[in-house]
Amino acid sequence: MAEGGSSEEELRAIVRDLAVTPFFLGTFDKRFPGFISSQRITCAVVNTAGRETGGVHWLAMAWNPRSKTFYMFDPFGFSDSKLKQVYSFEYEGLLRRSAIASTPDRCVTLAKSNETIQGPNSAACGLFCCMFLHAFVNWPDNPFNHNPTMGPLKSVPNYKLYDPTVQHVLWENQEKLYKFLEKNSAYFRAHAAAIKTRTAFNKLKQ
C-alpha cells in the first residue's frame, strides 16, 4: 500500500508511539488466527486482504478477557454481509478460535462498530485503527465512544456513507484524527506531509 493508505511498518511505528505496543500482537493480513490463549488485554490491526495483494482495508481487533469481549472496529462500520460482499472478508473463524482458546466456557461477546466515521474515498483506515487501539488499551471496557480519544469523533449511519450532507462530518473526523496523531505520535509528526498525502480524504478518487 505504498501509493495509498498505510503500510504495516508505519502502523507499527504509530502504535508504538501511542503506547499500545505492550498489548499489540502486530499487523496481520486476512489470515489472522485470532486471540489464542490470551489472558490479558491484547489487540491487532488486520487487513481484509492477503498480504500478497498489498492490502485493501484495515480493521482493528481487540480482546478484553475480563469481560470476555471481542471488539471489531471498522472505520466504515460495514455490516457482516457488506464486509463479505465488498472485501470477501469473514471473521467467524478467528472469532471462534479466539473463543475456544481464550475462555473456559468458549463463549465471547462480540462488540462491533456499526456506524461510519471515515469518508468513502478516504485511505486513512489504518490510522483510524491506531486511534481506536489507543482508546482500547486505555479504556478497554468502553473503547468505541465516551472516552477522550474516540469521543470527539462523530459517527453517521453506514447507509449514509456516500450522502453528500454528511461528508463534512467525516472530513472533520479525519482532521481530528490527524490532530490526535500530531499530538501523540513522533513518527506521524516526522512524516506528516507524506502520510496525509497517502491517506487523504479523497485519495480513492485520485
Curated annotation (Swiss-Prot):
GO biological process assignments: proteolysis
Active site: H57, D74, C125
Induction record: Expressed in the late phase of the viral replicative cycle.
Inhibition and activation profile: Requires DNA and protease cofactor for maximal activation. Inside nascent virions, becomes partially activated by binding to the viral DNA, allowing it to cleave the cofactor that binds to the protease and fully activates it. Actin, like the viral protease cofactor, seems to act as a cofactor in the cleavage of cytokeratin 18 and of actin itself.
GO molecular function annotations of the record: cysteine-type endopeptidase activity; DNA binding
Keywords: Autocatalytic cleavage, Disulfide bond, DNA-binding, Host nucleus, Hydrolase, Late protein, Protease, Thiol protease, Virion
Family, as annotated: Belongs to the peptidase C5 family.
Purpose of the protein: Cleaves viral precursor proteins (pTP, pIIIa, pVI, pVII, pVIII, and pX) inside newly assembled particles giving rise to mature virions. Protease complexed to its cofactor slides along the viral DNA to specifically locate and cleave the viral precursors. Mature virions have a weakened organization compared to the unmature virions, thereby facilitating subsequent uncoating. Without maturation, the particle lacks infectivity and is unable to uncoat. Late in adenovirus infection, in the cytoplasm, may participate in the cytoskeleton destruction. Cleaves host cell cytoskeletal keratins K7 and K18.
Other remarks on this protein: All late proteins expressed from the major late promoter are produced by alternative splicing and alternative polyadenylation of the same gene giving rise to non-overlapping ORFs. A leader sequence is present in the N-terminus of all these mRNAs and is recognized by the viral shutoff protein to provide expression although conventional translation via ribosome scanning from the cap has been shut off in the host cell.
Subunit structure: Interacts with protease cofactor pVI-C; this interaction is necessary for protease activation.
Protein name, as recorded: Protease
Organism: Canine adenovirus serotype 1 (strain CLL) (CAdV-1)
Gene: L3
